[in-house]
């Protein structure tokens, strides 16, 4: 009997040991999320968090948005918070600005920022200037968002980049996300900001999936407006970009790395207020600078960066003149081959970097 009892107790002890054993719990894995889904998730979380937030624009409700960025929000929040508007940018932008002045937090979607020109008086004269003109008594917490810059085959009237246009205006904050992390963190910060914020998205990036880090999956995740991010560390040259060209810069950096050239790639994230300190610190390390943007060259984002570097402490660290890579100084052509030659490509960035380094 003792032998039998020993046979029984042995497995029981082993089972007890298994029950007491502590297993390692790994952190939740990063998930793949498209830029479209990231913006949608960010808006959803803020709509849920604050009942003063609402979305309006053309086809944003029952149709789920022209680019499906607002998919599912109308079914969840209803007609009073997800509002379809007539095709009248001046009209619905004015309604949104008035709602912001009354204490709500509207998200005003333009089907493309080219159409925001129809509402420029509301954006600049009403939204951007009111806080200053009221001596700080009247905030205008509104987000103007939608696709910006070149798309594919939509020609001159649908392909402009408005980063420099809106970045020129005091009273506005201007953000320009590249990946899903940028998109979610910036839309949430923009909605919570008490100033008018212009969020320049990119139609060609909506369907691109990126890994969303664990911290970005939190409902409390925010990206500070006015802070750039170093996407790739390097020692030979600083390359600064925003929106879709950030990806082109990283591709160029990967190619050049095989040749022994290490590029430091900075994702601006915010156009205004610009994180010039991050750019200066990088230039002081690499001693070379290239800026990349999809907009026109004259009075552009790159021109502003170069001017600020020239006026600041980093200028004395440059070993060569800064070089800009921009869109061509023409209205966007319709033909694909001309369109491709009108916006910066990876080969153009590589050429500019080698030119700056005199290679």
UniProtKB/Swiss-Prot annotation:
The keyword Oxidoreductase applies. Gene3D superfamilies: 3.40.50.920, 3.40.50.970. GO terms for molecular function: metal ion binding; pyruvate dehydrogenase (acetyl-transferring) activity. Residues 1-30 form a transit peptide. The record marks 319 as: Important for interaction with DLAT. It catalyses: N(6)-[(R)-lipoyl]-L-lysyl-[protein] + pyruvate + H(+) = N(6)-[(R)-S(8)-acetyldihydrolipoyl]-L-lysyl-[protein] + CO2. GO terms for biological process: glucose metabolic process; pyruvate decarboxylation to acetyl-CoA; tricarboxylic acid cycle. K(+) binds at residues 142, 190-191, 193, 195. Keywords: Acetylation, Carbohydrate metabolism, Glucose metabolism, Metal-binding, Mitochondrion, Oxidoreductase, Phosphoprotein, Potassium, Pyruvate, Thiamine pyrophosphate, Transit peptide, Tricarboxylic acid cycle. The modification Phosphotyrosine is found at residue 67. It comes from the Eukaryota. GO terms for cellular component: mitochondrial matrix; mitochondrion; pyruvate dehydrogenase complex. The pyruvate dehydrogenase complex catalyzes the overall conversion of pyruvate to acetyl-CoA and CO(2), and thereby links the glycolytic pathway to the tricarboxylic cycle. Heterotetramer of two PDHA1 and two PDHB subunits. The heterotetramer interacts with DLAT, and is part of the multimeric pyruvate dehydrogenase complex that contains multiple copies of pyruvate dehydrogenase (E1), dihydrolipoamide acetyltransferase (DLAT, E2) and lipoamide dehydrogenase (DLD, E3). These subunits are bound to an inner core composed of about 48 DLAT and 12 PDHX molecules. Interacts with DLAT. This is Pyruvate dehydrogenase E1 component subunit beta, mitochondrial. It comes from Rattus norvegicus.
């Amino acid at each position: 009997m003792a032998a039998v009892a020993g046979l029984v107790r042995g497995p029981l002890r082993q089972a007890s040991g298994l029950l007491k054993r502590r297993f390692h719990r790994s952190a939740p894995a990063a998930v793949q999320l498209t830029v479209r889904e990231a913006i949608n998730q960010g808006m959803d979380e803020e709509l849920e968090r604050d009942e003063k937030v609402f979305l309006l624009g053309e086809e944003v409700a029952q149709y789920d948005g022209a680019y499906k960025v607002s998919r599912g929000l109308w079914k969840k929040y209803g007609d009073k918070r997800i509002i379809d508007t007539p095709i009248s940018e001046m009209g619905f932008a004015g309604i949104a600005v008035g709602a912001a002045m009354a204490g709500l937090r509207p998200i005003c979607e333009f089907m493309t920022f080219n159409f925001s020109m129809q509402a420029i008086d509301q954006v600049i004269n009403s939204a951007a200037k009111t806080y200053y003109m009221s001596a700080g008594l009247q905030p205008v917490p509104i987000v103007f968002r939608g696709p910006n810059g070149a798309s594919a085959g939509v020609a001159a009237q649908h392909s402009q980049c408005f980063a420099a246009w809106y970045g020129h205006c005091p009273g506005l904050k201007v953000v320009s996300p590249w990946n899903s992390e940028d998109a979610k963190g910036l839309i949430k910060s923009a909605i919570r900001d008490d100033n008018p914020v212009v969020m320049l998205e990119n139609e060609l990036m909506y369907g691109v999936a990126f890994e969303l880090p664990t911290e970005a999956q939190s409902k409390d995740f925010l990206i500070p407006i006015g802070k750039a991010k170093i996407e790739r560390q390097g020692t030979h040259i600083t390359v600064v970009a925003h929106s879709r060209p950030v990806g082109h810069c990283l591709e160029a950096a990967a190619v050049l790395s095989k040749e022994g050239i290490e590029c430091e790639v900075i994702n601006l994230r915010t156009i205004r207020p610009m994180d010039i300190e991050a750019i200066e610190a990088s230039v002081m390390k690499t001693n070379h600078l290239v800026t990349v943007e999809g907009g026109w060259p004259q009075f552009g984002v790159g021109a502003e960066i170069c001017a600020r570097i020239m006026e600041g402490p980093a200028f004395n660290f440059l070993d060569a003149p800064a070089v800009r890579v921009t869109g061509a100084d023409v209205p966007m052509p319709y033909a694909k081959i001309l369109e491709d030659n009108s916006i910066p490509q990876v080969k153009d960035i590589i050429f500019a970097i080698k030119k700056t380094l005199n290679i």
